[in-house]
Amino acid sequence: MANIASAKKRARQAENNRAHNAALRSRLRTYIKKVILAVDSGDLTKAQEAFRQAVPIIDSSVNKGLIHRNKAARSKSRLNARVKALALQAAS
């Protein structure tokens, strides 16, 4: 354990930041799972709405430094591909 006051403060801040980032990461994963579950259920409107809600969450995760911008782009692309595949399946 740190003895210097500034090191103690940094340890406290690191713990607070870790907990905060964990909550944000959990929220991100939850929104991604909502899209996947909606697509798997076969409900197109629900899947599209879940995707619309997930995109800003993914983008804000990049701005907060939780994930890399390429990972965000990849996630959005894959989710969008699932939704579009469901739309094509529903149309035919």
Swiss-Prot record:
Highest taxon in the source lineage: Bacteria
Keyword Ribosomal protein assigned: yes
Pfam families for this protein: Ribosomal_S20p (PF01649)
Any Gene Ontology CC annotation: cytosol
GO MF term set: small ribosomal subunit rRNA binding; structural constituent of ribosome
Keywords associated with the record: Ribonucleoprotein, Ribosomal protein, RNA-binding, rRNA-binding
Protein purpose: Binds directly to 16S ribosomal RNA.
HAMAP family listed in its UniProt record: Ribosomal_bS20
The protein's name: Small ribosomal subunit protein bS20
Biological source species: Methylococcus capsulatus (strain ATCC 33009 / NCIMB 11132 / Bath)
